[in-house]
Amino acid sequence: MIIDAAKGIDNLHPMISGVLVIADYVIQQRLNVEPHLTFGNSGAHAAGSLHYKNRAVDIDWPPWNERPQDIDVIAAKLRLYLGRDFDVVAENTHLHIEHDPK
């Protein structure tokens, strides 16, 4: 996974750190491209976002919207692998993944 330190990976919750490894594997296995961490705890997010609590990341890959069916398959696989304490949401430009224990 391509990670720019300016994207806010310092102090990520340990559960989110593990997400990066799993997402990297799932995306590379499906698409054979290296995913990008677009945001960790940096950037502007909605009020109350789990990004600010170090419990969310945004991930994309090039080209993001070329094959929408891949986005759905990858999101579904991540939901399966990560379990019910994680939310995986396909946004317009990225996957949003957060640790939100139920």
Language model features: what each stretch is:
Residues 1-31:
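Active-site acidic/histidine clusters and adjacent loop/turn architecture
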Residues 6-12, 36, 41-57, 61-102:
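Catalytic cores and adjacent binding grooves of peptidoglycan-active enzymes
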